[in-house]
Amino acid sequence: MDNIIVAIDGPAGSGKSTIAKLIAKKFNFTYIDTGAMYRMITLYLLENNINFDDLKEIEKALKNINLDMQGDKFYLNDVDVSTKIREKRINENVSKVASIKIVRDNLVNLQRKISNNKNVILDGRDIGTVVFPNAKVKIFLVAAAEERARRRYNEFLEKKVEITYDEVLKSLKERDYIDSTRKESPLKKADEAIELDTTNLTIEDVINFISKKIEKVK
């Protein structure tokens, strides 16, 4: 039987990571958090004072970066950066870094390599359109901006990050704009993807819906 690839795309705060993790656990699939990969690259560039427009320096940097993911733990050159990659400065810059072609090309290759010969579920912005256009299940999660901001704000509160709801909403809308208008792999629904509005759905509702789609292709 062919390996199953499940692609979950959607804007920031639509519930992609939460849902993807739970689905992976339910079906014993490998979960690949592509957003965390871009966050780790963003962290490296910021901490090494590399300008996002300096493509030569970025290309050099990519050769010195080793990413490792173990469950909810993320390692950048063997250092646990799981908390750091969720900081406000990363949120404000990750969409800019994700729009850089050499960064995208590098990470798309890595995502395909990790997924080779496995049943995987990936979440991101361009999984169903660019990374795995032949994925057997493609879901595009959406939700009202205010609801997505509320979810993100609650996540920040749990992590004791000092930020206001209005700041979260503003940042999220800015990311939506950058993600959907960027030249490289813009955020858009794949033609065959099923769009699911999670604004008024529970996590269980969403998992049940996607699970049925996976069962059909198993």
Curated annotation (Swiss-Prot):
Cell wall biogenesis/degradation found in the keyword field: no
GO molecular function: (d)CMP kinase activity; ATP binding; CMP kinase activity; dCMP kinase activity
Top EC category: transferase
Residues that hold ATP according to the record: G10, P11, A12, G13, S14, G15, K16, S17, T18
GO biological process terms held by the UniProt record: nucleobase-containing small molecule interconversion; pyrimidine nucleotide metabolic process
Compartments, record wording: Cytoplasm
GO cellular component, one term: cytosol
Reaction equation(s) it catalyzes: CMP + ATP = CDP + ADP; dCMP + ATP = dCDP + ADP
EC number: 2.7.4.25
InterPro entries from the UniProt entry: Cytidylate_kin, Cytidylate_kinase_dom, P-loop_NTPase
UniProt cross-references to HAMAP family, sorted A to Z: Cytidyl_kinase_type1 (MF_00238)
NCBIfam families for the chain: cmk
Protein name stated in the entry: Cytidylate kinase
Lineage: Bacteria, Fusobacteriati, Fusobacteriota, Fusobacteriia, Fusobacteriales
Gene name in the database record: cmk
